[in-house]
């Protein structure tokens, strides 16, 4: 972890861990139609986290599938552009994981 972020993480680790747990509790299984609302809820969670981080132009963009979450912060002219790309959905649990083998 870069030294510049370490004091922030140390000072906020309980809150950050609780926020991560809240996010992980959302069953955002994108391949399961019964979790469509949960995927939407996960997108809204991510959008709010971006707002809380002071990103700007936060948008939930509708698509033919699941929503896309976008934000930017364009206040560093002359500095390199950074693109962060990821997904906020999860895969269904593997029924074999966590089962006792007989």
Regions found by a protein language model. Give the residues of each.
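Acidic/His- and Gly-rich active-site-bordering loop/insert found
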Residues: 2-99
């Amino acid at each position: 972890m870069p030294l510049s972020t370490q004091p922030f993480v140390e000072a906020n680790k309980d809150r950050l861990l609780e926020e991560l747990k809240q996010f992980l509790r959302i069953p955002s299984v994108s391949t399961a139609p019964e979790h469509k609302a949960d995927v939407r809820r996960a997108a809204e969670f991510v959008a709010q986290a971006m707002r809380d981080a002071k990103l700007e132009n936060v948008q939930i963009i509708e698509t033919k599938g699941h929503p896309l979450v976008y934000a930017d912060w364009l206040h560093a002219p002359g500095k390199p552009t950074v693109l962060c790309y990821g997904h906020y959905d999860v895969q269904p649990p593997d029924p074999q994981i966590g089962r006792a083998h007989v």
